């Protein structure tokens, strides 16, 4: 059987950043579950919105035109083409986000509430809905609970406003479809820049595992996801950063068949099936290991 890949030419027009109730100098949110740094720029907030300085409403849209080789071509991101169409205009993303920060007596917040929707011609879905609580004594710990991006890898958490391309890599889309999941996460990230470990961030969280593919968790198996990230170090005109990630989870077996890698009689690598009835209802392991590094040239 010969499989042919149908190529799709995508031409994103532009990304429009719509900012409301923001300071004159834009400090946007680079990572999906982080706090917007503009909350701390008190002296640049316009007096007319002084009353709402702890509230941010932001958004952006990414209109797109796509041309495929034939009608009804499958598309990995954005949905398949309709039966009688090989070209289309579409809204790849149209986001509106509301962030509210509960201030503390210090310059750092007590809590962050974040809510984001994606409203396109395909419907309206919730992308983020989480509460982040900060430890205010030493300002190094936080807890995040709700629907938010899973802390695995660099690209999964990187906002599309900062990526070089509109879409994440195919690997990220396959392993982490939708990027988000429901769970709880604990983070170590010193807020004070003078702290000796201010360049380190550690996340560890527990998640349902199915992401946005279902309305509820379909089994009792949860995903453990953790990530150690080294924030950028500057060397002249270069910034170097990196991290390591680990996911340990599983799926409940709906059948008695379990496939594992093995060896054939001639030494070839094959999948070997185990059809024992004891496999029914057990957990099939899902373990991911990741490492990433970023090098940025300032110019």
PLM regions and their residue ranges:
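N-terminal periplasmic/intermembrane-space "pro-region" immediately following the signal or transit peptide
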Residues: 2, 25-62, 69-71
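Bacterial Sec-dependent N-terminal signal peptides
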Residues: 1-31
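Outer membrane beta-barrel
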Residues: 46, 50-69, 77, 81-212, ...
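A generic membrane alpha-helix/interface feature
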Residues: 9, 71, 78, 164, ...
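Surface-exposed beta-loop-beta
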Residues: 213-299
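Short aromatic-enriched loop/helix-cap "lid" or pocket-rim segments at secondary-structure transitions
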Residues: 71-72, 156-159, 254-258
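Surface-exposed, low-hydrophobicity segments enriched in Gly/Pro/acidic/Ser residues
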Residues: 29-40, 44-47, 155, 176, ...
């Amino acid at each position: 059987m010969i499989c042919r890949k149908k190529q799709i030419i995508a031409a994103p027009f532009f990304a429009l950043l719509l900012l409301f109730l923001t300071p004159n100098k834009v400090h946007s949110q680079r990572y999906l579950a982080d706090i917007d740094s503009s909350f701390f720029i008190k002296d640049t907030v316009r007096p007319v919105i002084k009353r709402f300085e702890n509230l941010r409403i932001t958004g952006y849209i990414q209109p797109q035109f796509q041309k495929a080789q034939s009608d009804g071509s499958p598309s990995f991101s954005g949905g398949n083409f309709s039966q009688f169409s090989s070209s289309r205009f579409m809204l790849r993303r149209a986001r509106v986000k509301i962030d509210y920060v509960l201030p503390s007596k210090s310059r750092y917040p007590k809590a962050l509430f974040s809510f984001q929707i994606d409203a396109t011609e395909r419907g309206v879905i919730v992308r983020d809905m989480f509460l982040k609580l900060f430890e205010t004594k030493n300002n190094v710990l936080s807890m995040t609970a709700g629907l938010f991006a899973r802390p695995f890898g660099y690209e999964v958490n990187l906002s599309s406003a900062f990526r070089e391309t509109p879409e994440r890599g195919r690997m990220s889309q396959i392993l982490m479809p939708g990027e988000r999941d429901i769970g709880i996460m604990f983070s170590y990230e010193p807020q004070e820049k003078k702290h000796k470990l201010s360049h380190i961030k550690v996340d560890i969280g527990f998640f349902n595992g199915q992401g946005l593919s279902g309305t509820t968790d379909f089994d009792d198996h949860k995903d453990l996801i953790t990530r150690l990230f080294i924030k950028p170090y500057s060397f002249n005109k270069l910034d170097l950063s990196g991290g390591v990630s680990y996911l340990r989870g599983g799926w409940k077996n709906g059948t008695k068949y379990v496939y594992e890698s093995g060896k054939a009689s001639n030494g070839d690598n094959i999948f070997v099936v185990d059809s024992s009835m004891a496999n029914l209802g057990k957990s099939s392991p899902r373990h991911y290991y990741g490492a990433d590094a970023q090098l940025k040239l300032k110019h």
